[in-house]
Amino acid sequence: MAKYFGTDGIRGEVANSTITVEFTQKLGNAVGSLINQKNYPKFVIVGQDTRSSGGFLKFALVSGLNAAGIDVLDLGVVPTPVVAFMTVKYRAAAGFVITASHNKFTDNGIKLFSSNGFKLDDALEEEVEDMIDGDFIYQPQFKFGSYKILANAIDEYIESIHSRFAKFVNYKGKVVVDCAHGAASHNFEALLDKFGINYVSIASNPDGLNINVGCGATCVSNIKKAVKEQKADLGISLDGDADRIIIVDENGQEIDGDGILNILAQYSDICGGTNGIVGTQMTNMSYENHYRANKIPFIRSKVGDRYVLEDLVKYGYKIGGESSGHVINLNFGTTGDGLFTAIQLLAIFSQADKPVSEFKLQGELMQQTLINVPLTKKVAREDLQKVASDVNDVEKRLGNRGRVLLRPSGTEPVLRVMVEADDKSLATNEAEYLVEKVKQKLV
């Protein structure tokens, strides 16, 4: 079991968890020393979101890397997918992002990309963890690394997207965008300006403390309200580091990551094509049934965009994602990318003269009830055996009307209890039953 890494890097409350200056410096030194051991290029890229703690954590990371003899190129405040993109483009050994994604500003963390722009696999994470727990390694003074800032790094990313999609995007509707006061602030607007989109931007004034507060992809009510007030045709909401996207239609109705994947699947020719779709254990059964009815191969990965990526590579598919809004298209990128997904959607919406609501899967979706149960410590999968009989009882009562999923969070001491059924009250009642059993046996 990983000691430091969760499902998406390392994350926690600043100063009251693993996320300290001391740890971040050791992480930088550990990765730098591993780069030396493997004889990779002695050069990495770093970026950050808008949290107030981002600066001092970044410089702690840089100091550890420089001590190990690694040169650092700092992109400043940029979306996470920009770091992945630039890591590949500049042939860096690794890319780091100081971010806690959709979490509150008091949290922070580190996401880490390998030279191919993919997140680290479990084996490489274990190597990094072993190095963290080892000695701090200094290179001889004449081999210390350098630190440089690359201004306007977003421009190269924007130009890459524009060169591929300019011929497809001719969207005439009015768009509202919610940047979560995060890394997309100003950067997403620059991308939309390049494509000539008519938009109104909200939650794009970061102050270091307001990231994800009442806004962004985990607070969809903000974009729903704005779409109605602006009488807009489309709303696009990103999270703090812009690797997630949720959209709403002209009626203010949410289309989550599952729905976005379905739209991309219908118009995959515009998006580079795919032989199948990868969802996750959380993907609504209605979409799975739809894919199978239309002979579109579909598989479920574990929750976490790096697991989606692993299965995309394993099965040779190109498009996949999560209900939460991580969407990956391997035709053009290597990680969840809210900005690029938005441009793909705008390209699709430009091709047909119909409202966004008509691109959605028609009919009622299966009803999901998801309850997060706080625990005193992270729960291991073997702990779930304590409630296995209770889960079995619920599954028997549901029969073929639904399913159950109990999933420990990879980033915090929380157990996610999800019940899906063809009736909302049934899903809610059974979920609440399981929550009580979890509290009795695991809390």
Swiss-Prot record:
Keywords: Isomerase, Magnesium, Metal-binding, Phosphoprotein
Pfam families, per database record: PGM_PMM_I, PGM_PMM_II, PGM_PMM_III, PGM_PMM_IV
Residue numbers carrying Phosphoserine: S101
PTM comment: Activated by phosphorylation.
Function: Catalyzes the conversion of glucosamine-6-phosphate to glucosamine-1-phosphate.
Catalytic activity entry: alpha-D-glucosamine 1-phosphate = D-glucosamine 6-phosphate
Enzyme class: isomerase
Protein name in the entry: Phosphoglucosamine mutase
Cofactor binding summary note: Binds 1 Mg(2+) ion per subunit.
Residues at the catalytic site: S101 (phosphoserine intermediate)
Listed cofactors: Mg(2+)
One of the GO biological process terms: UDP-N-acetylglucosamine biosynthetic process
Binding annotation for Mg(2+): S101, D239, D241, D243
GO molecular function: magnesium ion binding; phosphoglucosamine mutase activity; phosphomannomutase activity
GO cellular component: cytosol
EC number(s) from the headed UniProt entry: 5.4.2.10
Family: Belongs to the phosphohexose mutase family.
UniProt cross-references to SUPFAM superfamilies, sorted A to Z: Phosphoglucomutase, C-terminal domain (SSF55957), Phosphoglucomutase, first 3 domains (SSF53738)
